[in-house]
């Protein structure tokens, strides 16, 4: 029985083949070389985490498990709201079929703010890495559940070639062990199971203590309140990727500011 991740991989491989046929790699690489210089995604998170929390705020219109998340979807306005609200970096969904994302959303977001941006997509081919840089991405995502070790190494090397950082995402002890063979300092612990889409913060509680001290932990998914962040910080997570719980708020700027507040003084959550 195929999982959601299996289905995503199937259409992504078709999409990659179609894009290669439509736009040769040399053209993508020319665009990547012409793109504005990377802004230092990992550096920004590390600096923020040294004195507080590093927040990767996500621009996400929909998801396979929840359907449409936000109807009022003005990407530049959302990016500015996140920046003003205190986000450290942005994550922008560019996958269309499952998340109603688009390449142009990344361009729009990065042009609207000064924050480093992650291209949030399912990457399997170094062509997509060059594509990410051409779009202005400062960081890419490698999901260990969806790639082989050799693919992960190739994607990471390509990102390094283009001056981008890599967020390596894991959900299990086995995936974490594999991720440790990569050079990237950023380890994303996804609290969402990509096979079932069930969410549990226990994933971060279990894995965070196993992450080498020289890595920077980013807890992802299922984060709704300042208390959630404070709880996971006790396990070593100082950076967080938050999307849906912020995207559902009418006032995204206020919601961003609220979730970063000290839980002892915060008035409720988002």
From Swiss-Prot:
Pathway it acts in?
A: Amino-acid biosynthesis; L-tryptophan biosynthesis; L-tryptophan from chorismate: step 4/5
Q: SUPFAM superfamilies attached here?
A: Ribulose-phoshate binding barrel (SSF51366)
List the CDD domains hit by this protein, alphabetically.
Answer: IGPS (cd00331)
Q: Which GO terms describe its molecular function?
A: indole-3-glycerol-phosphate synthase activity; phosphoribosylanthranilate isomerase activity
Q: Kindly state which keywords UniProt assigns to this record, in alphabetical order.
A: Amino-acid biosynthesis, Aromatic amino acid biosynthesis, Decarboxylase, Lyase, Tryptophan biosynthesis
Which BP terms in the Gene Ontology apply to this protein?
L-tryptophan biosynthetic process
User: What reaction does this enzyme carry out catalytically?
Assistant: 1-(2-carboxyphenylamino)-1-deoxy-D-ribulose 5-phosphate + H(+) = (1S,2R)-1-C-(indol-3-yl)glycerol 3-phosphate + CO2 + H2O
The enzyme's first-digit EC class, named in words, is lyase
Q: Name one Pfam family in it.
A: IGPS
Q: What is its EC number?
A: 4.1.1.48
Query: Does the keyword Amino-acid biosynthesis belong to this entry?
Result: yes
Family indicated by similarity: Belongs to the TrpC family.
Q: What is this protein called?
A: Indole-3-glycerol phosphate synthase
Which organism is the protein's source?
Cereibacter sphaeroides (strain ATCC 17023 / DSM 158 / JCM 6121 / CCUG 31486 / LMG 2827 / NBRC 12203 / NCIMB 8253 / ATH 2.4.1.) (Rhodobacter sphaeroides)
